[in-house]
């Protein structure tokens, strides 16, 4: 029987984002790994980020954070593009998405 679980992968930049969160790495990782069972947990984004999704989660004492990711149904992969505080995340995500699309890594 085929598994319905998705493989959650992080871009190099998203890995750097995660390392910067130091004390919260475990909490953030647990939030992101929820995508293994439900990759559509986050909400779809529009405009220049169409085709990506955003997952919101809170970190005690640090506020609201987001991760922006792409779901590939064919390969059962969730590719995390960015992780960080809500402030300016979509502007930063746009730059990363543009670069990844230009390189042919995401549609």
Question: What residue spans do the PLM features occupy?
Answer:
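Sparse recognition of residues in long alpha-helices and their boundaries
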Residues: 30, 44, 84-85
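A broad, low-specificity signal marking well-ordered, structured residues that form hydrophobic/aromatic
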Residues: 8, 53, 78
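Short beta->alpha junction loops/turns
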Residues: 21, 38, 83-86
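Arg/Lys-rich, positively charged N-terminal/basic patches that mediate binding to nucleic acids
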Residues: 1-32, 105-107
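A short, surface-exposed loop/turn module that caps and links secondary-structure elements
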Residues: 33-60
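Enriched for short, Lys/Arg-rich terminal
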Residues: 3-4, 57-107
């Amino acid at each position: 029987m085929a598994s319905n679980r998705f493989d959650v992968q992080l871009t190099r930049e998203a890995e750097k984002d995660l390392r910067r969160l130091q004390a919260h790495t475990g909490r953030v990782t647990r939030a992101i790994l929820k995508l293994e069972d439900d990759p559509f947990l986050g909400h779809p984004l529009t405009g220049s980020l169409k085709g990506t999704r955003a997952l919101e989660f809170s970190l005690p004492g640090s506020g609201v954070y987001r991760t922006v990711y792409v779901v590939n149904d064919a390969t059962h992969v969730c590719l995390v593009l960015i992780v960080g505080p809500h402030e300016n995340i979509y502007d930063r995500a746009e730059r990363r998405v543009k670069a990844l699309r230009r390189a042919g890594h995401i549609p």
